[in-house]
Amino acid sequence: MKCLLLALGLALMCGIQATNIPQTMQDLDLQEVAGKWHSVAMAASDISLLDSESAPLRVYIEKLRPTPEDNLEIILREGENKGCAEKKIFAEKTESPAEFKINYLDEDTVFALDTDYKNYLFLCMKNAATPGQSLVCQYLARTQMVDEEIMEKFRRALQPLPGRVQIVPDLTRMAERCRI
């Protein structure tokens, strides 16, 4: 009987933790996310979007800058012609404070999945016409150090997203030309 109660208690505890998976944020303070960031991990619904340095959506976000109109300027680096190029993406605010419209390759939406503002930001890009087929997310950190607890939180945050999202291995151990 004691084992049954213990098993029931553990099942309830696991169930409570499973329901604590972050969804798209309801609010985002642009002034708090402003500043320098490092791409620590990437994930995609189609791994070919990230599987090589020259893959179309393998970009390294460097900085986020809010504009006076509450839009967001995203400064990133990407592989281009055996080198690295800095790009700027203008992200226009939408009715949702954590979601922005963009025009970058086939992607049209950027959204914040979760952040604590000081240590990490989970940022995703998707194509609204094919949300399960073209979704890329990044675990951004204020430093280049990987926090295993936050990495696990990133994995859990990706689980409810549409499609089968695959994570690219730890980017901090790779010597890629565009990674700073």
Curated annotation (Swiss-Prot):
Superkingdom of the organism of origin: Eukaryota
Family named by the database record: Belongs to the calycin superfamily. Lipocalin family.
Database matches in Pfam families: Lipocalin (PF00061)
Protein localization: Secreted
A GO molecular-function annotation: retinol binding
Disulfide bonding pattern of the chain: 84-178, 124-137
Cross-referenced CDD domains: lipocalin_beta-LG-like
CC annotations in GO: extracellular region
Organism name: Equus caballus (Horse)
Gene that encodes the chain: LGB1
Subunit annotation: Monomer.
Major place of residence: secreted
Function of the molecule: Lactoglobulin is the primary component of whey, it binds retinol and is probably involved in the transport of that molecule.
Extent of the signal sequence: 1-18
UniProt KW Calcium keyword: no
Keywords recorded for this protein, A-Z: Disulfide bond, Milk protein, Retinol-binding, Secreted, Signal, Transport
Name recorded for this polypeptide: Beta-lactoglobulin-1
Lineage: Eukaryota, Metazoa, Chordata, Craniata, Vertebrata
